[in-house]
Amino acid sequence: MRIVLFCENKYAIDILNPIQEHVTKQHLPHEILWYIHKPKIDSFPYADQVKWTNSIQEVYDFKPEAIYVPGNIVPYYLPGVKIQIFHGYAAEKKDHWIIRRYFDTYFTQGPYFTSHFEALAKRYGDFEVLETGWPKQDWIKENLHKYDADREKLLRESGKETLIL
């Protein structure tokens, strides 16, 4: 499968990188192209490690089968299934529940958001909703106890029960 990881804003890099890592780690037969929006992202930290472009034309020519977007818009004329990845907890934002008709699928981060978007999917009838979790948070779960020994050492050395760093 040809996949585009679409980064219009710098924060999108950390949200999409777990997808790149998963494909690489699992040796999956997918080809990934990152789109980096140059006016908003002046440096791409993985530039020497992954295939990437600043050109929408190159994205189009790549003929993606799926485009992952942690943002609100993606050019409608690009080929492939367009997937919006929700990545925060800002349900109070006025535009959070607006359906802009750019996306075929919405990946939601939890039951609260999933239920709201499923109701919208029934109303609009032209997109799907899938609860996937929040890939940017996966690191926390995977490394939850990685620093326990360091924590205990700091507490012992400081003579404190808790520390706020």
PLM features: residue spans?
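Active-site and donor-binding regions of nucleotide-sugar-utilizing enzymes
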Residues: 4-148, 154-155
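Conserved donor-binding/catalytic core segment of Leloir-type glycosyltransferases
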Residues: 158-165
